[in-house]
């Protein structure tokens, strides 16, 4: 894959998937993987969660952290036992080693970017 420069969401081909054993099928596209960047980015994905679907609860390693940037819609974010409402404009950090998941209980499709970063230093367990 060439270095990442620019991508338009309307040009993406979305693939159905069941994310981390979540409920139902979400749709996503890998915009760019690690090879497309010169920094510590593992990947940038665009995802759409139709009403009633979810990204299942899961945990990344201590060498990865993940960002969710919500573009539209609303959802319930579960992180380490706590649930928070998220909506358009929210940027959420899922910490290294932290458990998290996202569900869409609402009537509209939840659209977001998922960005995974490589941790330069490995965090100590909490």
Residue ranges and their predicted role:
Residues 39, 56-61, 103-105:
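Short histidine-centered beta-strand/loop micro-motifs
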Residues 96-121:
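Ligand-binding loop in jelly-roll beta-barrel domains
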Residues 81-97:
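Short acidic-glycine-tyrosine-enriched beta hairpin
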Residues 54-56, 76, 92, 96-102:
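Histidine-centered metal-chelating micro-motifs
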Residues 63-65, 69-75:
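Glycine- and acidic-residue-biased ligand/ion/polar-headgroup-sensing regions
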Residues 30-33, 45-62, 96:
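Conserved short histidine dyad/triad with adjacent acidic residue
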Residues 1-41, 57, 123-126:
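A short, N-terminal "cap"/entry segment at the start of jelly-roll beta-barrel domains
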